[in-house]
């Protein structure tokens, strides 16, 4: 098994979402001895935004790109190759102002490429990143699960489904800023979510 772990928190090793993602990866490795793990920390190695120059590079035929355009597309190619090779994708996601971190959005923009990770057909779009399990580890200071304030779940469900990844499991550590007891309970609840996701 090839496991791709994406850490999107700006807090590095102090990140709660990374802590939960690590727990998922540990369980996967325990049940799949010999699994290979690739870890990408998006805050420590930030990916450039999808700006006008990047769009220009992507829409320029490969044989007509400038060296700068070729280098820009190559950055995205690395991320695409990582997720194409993965059997399981584990993503640590904190909640920042009710959305996902900008570094995670940049990663999503990088891996979403027409004719590579999705395509348009006569019947509509078709995702090409199929047969992958996705585990999303959320860490939140408050409690927003199953409420209108949770914009993360519908967004990630939509974009991953668009890319062909429909086997998506969500793990929640919520209430982390609501006191020590609440934080302890949050991690216990996350472990229960992990057990259910891997059952």
Curated annotation (Swiss-Prot):
It is an enzyme of class 1 (oxidoreductase). It catalyses: 2 a quinone + NADH + H(+) = 2 a 1,4-benzosemiquinone + NAD(+); N,N-dimethyl-1,4-phenylenediamine + anthranilate + 2 NAD(+) = 2-(4-dimethylaminophenyl)diazenylbenzoate + 2 NADH + 2 H(+). Its cofactor is FMN. Binds 1 FMN per subunit. It comes from the Bacteria. The keyword Magnesium does not apply. The keyword Oxidoreductase applies. Pfam families: Flavodoxin_2 (PF02525). FMN binds at residues 9, 15-17, 95-98. One of its GO terms (molecular function) is FMN binding. Its EC number is 1.6.5.-, 1.7.1.17. HAMAP family: Azoreductase_type1. This is FMN-dependent NADH:quinone oxidoreductase. It comes from Aromatoleum aromaticum (strain DSM 19018 / LMG 30748 / EbN1).
